[in-house]
Amino acid sequence: MRSEVRSALVLGALAGLNVLVQRSRLNPDVLVPAGAAALLAGARASGLSSVELGLSRRQSARALPGAAVAAAVTAGAVAAAASLPVASGFRDDSRYADPAAAVRSAFLTIPLSVAVPEELLFRSVLDALLRRHLGDVGTTVVQAAAFGLWHALGAASLSHDNAGVAKAVGSVADGRGRTVTTVAGVVLATALAGLGFAVLRRRTDSVLPGIAVHWALNAAAALAGGIPRRRRASRATTW
């Protein structure tokens, strides 16, 4: 089967998986990892090597120290940004209303159901297939665009979940325009993140650093989301 056809099939599979995740009643925390495992198995069966996929032992061993440093720097940067007064609204996120939920998300849900499977889907399987016929630049652009669109269906609720996003979007749009603005902003932001993850994939020749940074970015944001409520709870119980 031609590489172009296989790439198109994987892009179609990603679109189908995304619809299932966002519109079905199936558990996304199980569905996304299962989908990633299935596509990875299919990629290996089609002839892609572990080196092409960025998953060989040698690649991972060489990338591990850098991945650890990158994760630490990312988490520190998010923590520093979250501590700024201007970011207070963005920390107020209803998805992490329960501090225990924020911790669970940071150390269980995000690594296992977000960072690892998404990096396998986009920077391993899709990346390896696209590089066979598009080259580095074309591959980077296509997978970044696909990564941005992956987040489109789930983006609409963000203006309701996050106080900072709601305020920012509300200052430029109202009604249906709020939803359109939120979705467009999320797609653009995640596409840019996809570009960054792709560059990391090229520079390190491994998927591991992308997984580490992806996890650190989302986990630190989740933990920061519980800060306002932890502080309010502390004040409420102080006599």
Per-segment meaning from a language model:
Residues R2-S50, A61-A68, S105:
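Alpha-helical transmembrane segments in multi-pass membrane proteins
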Residues R23-L26, L48-V51, A82-S94, A155-A163, ...:
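Transmembrane helix-loop junctions in multipass membrane proteins, especially transporters and channels
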Residues L14-Q22, L39-G47, A77-A82, H151, ...:
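Structural signal for membrane-spanning alpha-helices in multi-pass inner-membrane proteins
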Residues S50-A115, D127, R131-R132, A166-R176:
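Juxtamembrane helix-loop-helix connectors linking adjacent transmembrane helices
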Residues A13, A37-G42, A68, A72, ...:
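Membrane-active amphipathic alpha-helices enriched in small hydrophobic residues
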Residues M1, V5-R23, P111, A115, ...:
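Charged, low-complexity N-terminal segments of organelle-associated membrane proteins
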Residues R104-W239:
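Transmembrane helix-loop-helix hairpins at the membrane interface
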